[in-house]
Amino acid sequence: MITVHISGGEKMLKEAKKVSKKTKIIGVSVLTSLENNDLKKFYNIDNSKKLVSKMTKVALKSKIDGIVCSPKEIKIVKKISKKKLKIITPGIRLKNNNISKDDQKRIMQPKEAIKLGANYLVIGRPILNAKDPMKIINLINEEKI
């Protein structure tokens, strides 16, 4: 898998898909560290769901393989793409994580993101910063967190 940002536009996405025969092209939508007030500054849209909706349509027209989106936007991507796009979801946080100093804004627990339809979860800091990373991985796999 290779990620490219959807805001690069349809032409760029199509070209990436064209030159990448065996590698899946995944489009990054709105970063999970951005809040609605940030979106107003960058995109002149004050709602992440509206922007992800537009980006999903661009991803579909470009015929890329998947989309990276916040777990808060999984439902929108599924509805628009009719399961044609794989959904990769960062912003995964564990129930008891201390996330007060974390930069991720639109987050969800692993079990919830899977129930909504995420195909892949991106889980970094909750595992990397854990005292026992393997314990956390096993708990996630057993769906206990």
Predicted regions and their residues:
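Conserved anion-binding
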Residues: M1-K75, K79-I88, R93-I99
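C-terminal helical cap(s) of enzyme catalytic domains, especially alpha/beta-barrels
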Residues: L13-V19, I114-L116, P126-I145
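Glycine-rich phosphate-binding loop at the start of an alpha helix
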Residues: S53, I107-M108
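Structural motif
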Residues: S62, L116-G117
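Short hydrophobic alpha-helical runs that function as membrane-insertion/retention elements
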Residues: V68, L121-I123
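Glycine-rich beta-strand-to-loop/alpha-helix junction loops that act as flexible
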Residues: T89-P90, I123-P126
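Short glycine/threonine-rich catalytic loop with a Thr-x-Gly-x-Asp
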Residues: S100-R106
